């Protein structure tokens, strides 16, 4: 895998026709966990999120709500930013496609592609879905000319002169690129979807609209506005500009390009895995090494939708259960890349079992014993002398490699399972080793080793879980006597040597421990409202 010294990654720029839904929260939580993992490695990291704000759908939505398009965008953007704060998302840049600096980047990029001969005026005829902002093939339509994705909406017939991008010119180049970079599209199931789409033959696509006012004018023909995707994808580039820099492509691409990872939902895969690399090839720019399309979420086994009235409000969910709970459930319970389900009963069970019982109780029990047997200090012993086959050391020494590989592969569920295995082994070991009996026998050396190895295992689990549950990991670390905040990566790197903390055996003997307090309250299902 191509390893640059800096790591920029993106969520999609979310469409602002409506307030954020659970799917947007899911992608953003995953991106935030990946960004925190990279920062934990000491790698300069830039997490980009933002909003895609142009197009006919926004124009019509705003009109219905009796707002100006920009007022509408501003209100929805506030909703996204508030949710990201609530979910403890540490984004570095929030890219809005209505930003004036973005227009300058789009104009320069357009002119570069135009100079290459890749833009021409042509006639666009076809069935157009306003909700998708895209033309549909007749063979894909449902009965009564309805869109296969927005099945409650009829498509509209369009016949207009538009500007086109010569996607067909990049057919061979794209196929070669996919063959030489098999990891570009992940997971493999998504890669296969893209390859079969491309093999059917690429058609040039329209990049402008004639009767849409809400968008940037086409630089060479102000009568037309640029189509939402040509504008939106470039929002990733604009986001790379330093706040004070003049908005030129050279400035935007100077430090962070190529972006190392685009995280997206599989519904926008084609734009990121086909249109976007072709646009970049046309502009002679290096391509990002990885696009990862995750799966869809269902609720209680059913597709979520407003029409079905079973949507899951991410704000309400997070306010009720807390950010760590929501982050943990979605990253642990769903194999990243596959479709996954949310069920509230399961949600409560998983969090209580893993975080309140396995992790929380283990820390609490062990700290209480350390208070009783070791005056609330880390037991004193020779750490290096602990036998390599000690059940906790044996797992603990493998954690770093297993977990970092899993994070690099976006296998968040595997990260959680590996660390849970360490914690569950800790619980079993504590029961079997029975330090209370050893203490009564006066065997203080045995007590020291038992408590040290359990506390160290909890510490190591907290360290590696911190990208997923940063607040919980901070609480654990503070109870173990560190003044560490996993929410502040700058201060974190100044407080601890990260390269010591990522391995087993770092807890310092005789370090003062805090008073044991429960780190994760047991969750309860909301009681059904009395009729």
Where are these regions (language model features)?
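Generic structural concept
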Residues: 356, 360, 393, 397, ...
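Structured secondary-structure scaffolds
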Residues: 2-49, 101-105, 156-372, 415-419
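Basic, alpha-helical terminal appendages of large translation-related enzymes
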Residues: 1-6, 46, 122-127, 131, ...
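Aromatic-residue-lined binding/catalytic grooves and analogous aromatic/hydrophobic interfacial grooves
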Residues: 375, 413, 506
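Short helix-to-loop capping/linker segments positioned immediately adjacent to catalytic or ligand/cofactor-binding
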Residues: 182-185, 402-415, 464
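Short, charged/polar, low-complexity loop and linker segments
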Residues: 339-344, 397-405
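Conserved, charged catalytic cores of large soluble enzymes
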Residues: 2-14, 19, 31-205, 240-252, ...
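Non-transmembrane, amphipathic alpha-helical segments
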Residues: 347, 351, 388, 407, ...
């Amino acid at each position: 895998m191509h390893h640059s010294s800096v790591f920029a990654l993106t969520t999609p720029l979310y469409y602002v026709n409506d307030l954020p839904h659970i799917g947007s929260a899911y992608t953003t939580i995953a991106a935030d966990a990946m960004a925190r993992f990279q920062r934990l490695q000491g790698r300069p990291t830039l997490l980009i999120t933002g909003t895609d704000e142009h197009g006919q759908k926004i124009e019509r939505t705003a009109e219905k709500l009796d707002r100006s398009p920009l007022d509408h965008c501003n209100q929805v953007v506030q909703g996204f930013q508030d949710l990201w704060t609530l979910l403890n998302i540490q984004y570095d840049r929030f890219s809005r496609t209505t930003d004036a600096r973005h227009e300058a980047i789009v104009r320069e990029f357009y002119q570069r592609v135009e100079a290459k001969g890749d833009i021409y005026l042509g006639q666009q005829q076809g069935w157009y879905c306003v909700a998708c902002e895209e033309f549909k093939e007749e063979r894909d339509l449902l009965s009564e000319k309805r869109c296969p994705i927005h099945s409650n909406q009829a498509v509209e017939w369009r016949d207009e002169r538009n500007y086109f991008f010569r996607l067909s010119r990049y057919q061979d180049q794209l196929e070669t690129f996919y063959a030489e970079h098999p990891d570009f599209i992940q997971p493999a199931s998504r890669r296969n979807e893209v390859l079969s789409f491309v093999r059917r033959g690429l058609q040039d696509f329209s990049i402008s609209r004639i009767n849409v006012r809400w968008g940037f004018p086409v630089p060479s023909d102000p009568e037309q506005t640029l189509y939402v995707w040509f504008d939106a994808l470039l929002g990733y580039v604009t986001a790379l500009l330093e706040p004070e820099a003049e908005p030129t492509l050279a400035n935007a691409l100077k430090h962070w390009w190529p972006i190392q990872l685009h995280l997206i939902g599989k519904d926008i895969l084609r734009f990121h895995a086909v249109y976007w690399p072709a646009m970049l090839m046309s502009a002679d720019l290096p391509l990002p090494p990885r696009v990862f399309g995750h799966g869809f979420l269902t609720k209680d086994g059913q597709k979520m939708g407003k029409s079905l009235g079973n949507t899951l409000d991410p704000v309400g969910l997070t306010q009720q259960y807390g950010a760590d709970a929501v982050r943990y459930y979605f990253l642990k319970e769903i194999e990243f890349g596959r479709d996954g389900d949310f069920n509230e009963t399961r949600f409560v069970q998983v969090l209580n079992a893993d975080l309140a019982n396995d992790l929380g109780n283990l820390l609490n029990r062990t700290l209480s014993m350390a208070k009783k047997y070791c005056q609330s200090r880390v037991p004193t012993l020779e750490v290096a002398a602990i036998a390599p086959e000690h059940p906790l050391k044996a797992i603990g020494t493998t954690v770093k490699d297993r977990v970092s590989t899993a994070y690099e592969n976006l296998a968040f569920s595997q990260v959680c399972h590996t660390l849970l295995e360490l914690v569950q082994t800790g619980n079993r070991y504590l029961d079997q080793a029975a330090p209370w009996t050893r203490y009564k026998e006066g065997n203080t050396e045995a007590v020291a080793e038992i408590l040290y190895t359990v506390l160290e295992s909890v510490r190591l689990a907290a360290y590696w879980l911190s990208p997923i549950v940063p607040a919980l990991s901070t609480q654990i670390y503070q109870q173990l006597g560190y003044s560490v905040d996993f929410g502040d990566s700058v201060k974190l790197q100044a407080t601890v040597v990260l390269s010591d903390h990522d391995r087993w055996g770092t807890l310092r003997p005789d370090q003062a421990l805090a008073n044991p307090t429960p780190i994760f309250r047991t969750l309860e299902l909301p009681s059904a409202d009395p009729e």
